[in-house]
Amino acid sequence: MNSIRKFERIIAIDFEFATPPGEVPGVNCMVAYDICSKRWWKLDQRECLDRRSSPFPTDPSTLLVCFYATAELNCFKVLGWEMPARVIDLFVLQRALYNGLPLNWLKPDLEDQKLGRGLNDSLLFHGLHEFVNPEKKEMQQLSAAGGPFDSTTMGALIEYCTSDVAATAALFGKLAPKISQLPKGLDWLIYAGAYQKAVSSMEIRGVPIDYPLFTKMRENWEGIKTGLIEKVNANYGVFGG
């Protein structure tokens, strides 16, 4: 498994979505690009929701390349698509390579810039300036609003999503030769992707709670607090309210 060449498809992918507080993502669109065949897939919201499976194979012959994979895996989950067998995350790869080192310290020409760990900053760090999207924050806010979207707005979202996928593919080209620097190389990175699939399952399922008990506690919270205060104060006298 320690060779990228074994994969029939290496697919960079990105979803745009909206996630209301406490809810699972609502998918707005998806764009994917096979780095090997140079084939694109572009799906709007309705096309995503109407599909029962991914438009490309997700078996072990496909390597899915993401930047912050949990977000994309969550979208697979909510759409009911089969989870990809092999996933790598360029965000994780970059952190593994440079963790603890501010990126601007490593590049003299960027020493005056405070670089974060997001996609745009990673592109700058690796000299991929032409892929930096200056409208990224605005487009993220547009997607987060959740629609409904007219055809013009949906077209803009797909165009933005396409630019992120192109950037992810370009960043993969820069980082792929460095995978061998990891202690277990590609195997380690794929194991990290398997962990992110588990994280995605937890995020989509949510925190398991006893909801009837939670409701009862919430309805009686003031009395519970008063009882706790009285119990603690009997021994320590720390609450003077």
Feature map (PLM): residue ranges:
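Conserved "right-hand" nucleotidyltransferase catalytic core of DNA-directed polymerases
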Residues: 1-16, 21-29, 38, 113-114, ...
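Active-site-proximal helix-loop-helix substrate-binding element of RNase H-like nuclease domains
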Residues: 21, 28, 32, 36-52, ...
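Flexible, charged surface loops at secondary-structure boundaries
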Residues: 3-7, 55-61
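Short alpha-helical segments and helix-capping/turn motifs at coil-helix boundaries
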Residues: 13-16, 48-54
